[in-house]
Amino acid sequence: MLEVVGIDADAALVAQWRARVARAVHRLGWDGEPRIVARRHAKGMSLAVTAPFDQLFTATELNEWALCSALHDRDPSHWGALKETLVAAAIESGSASADTLPPAIDEEPALARLEKLAAAEARPDLRALVDATESRELPWLLDDELISIGCGAGSRSFPSSSLPFVADVPWSELHDVPTALVTGSNGKTTTVRLIAACLRAAGYRPGYSCTDGLFIAGETLDSGDYSGPVGARTVLR
């Protein structure tokens, strides 16, 4: 997702951005129908596109190029330095591709660059493992270091840098656990604690994460604000 603030993102610009995203997605051969969404808010607009889970860095580059290209075509005199700005930003961020694959504004070199980035980022081994997991209707969780299959006592985690072969996964030992998600503006932690107390009283061993910390069966694993995805993944694993 790309946040656009301080730019006149009118309907014409959004249409140009959307068309470029669609062409790039088609060029990359991403399966299915990607969602391409532009949502206006008080300070600007959010521009989002879905992508395969092993192509997310490429997707951010795609999204940024589509907007910059649309801006450049709308007013080349005002946005003439965009390419240099993108290259400088890539070098400053330490991007490994900045020297060999510098960002481009023109469509053909930009799409060729995205193809190379996508090929470098692709994880066919990870896709095969996820496909096998989903075919068995098991949940999976992924972060920068681990992929886990199953939840709770039925969960196993594997380093993303050394994935097992599908045939070597102990599928019969893996399973899901009942899971509840609590959302809202106020009272989430109180509600989660109340649910956990009810489950303990009923003889279950609930685990939960919240702004107080991580808890399993009434014991504190760690204190602090774990209301985000890290806390949820830790408990579910």
Describe the role of every protein-language-model region.
Residues 172-175, 197-237:
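ATP-dependent carboxylate-amine ligase catalytic core
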Residues 123-124, 190, 227-230:
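Residue-level recognition of alpha-helix initiation/capping sites
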Residues 128, 132, 194-197, 234-235:
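Alpha-helical scaffold segments in soluble metabolic enzymes
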Residues 178-195, 199:
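Glycine-rich phosphate-binding P-loop
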Residues 1-179, 201-206, 211-212:
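Preference for protein termini
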Residues 116-119, 185, 222-225:
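Hydrophobic alpha-helical scaffolding
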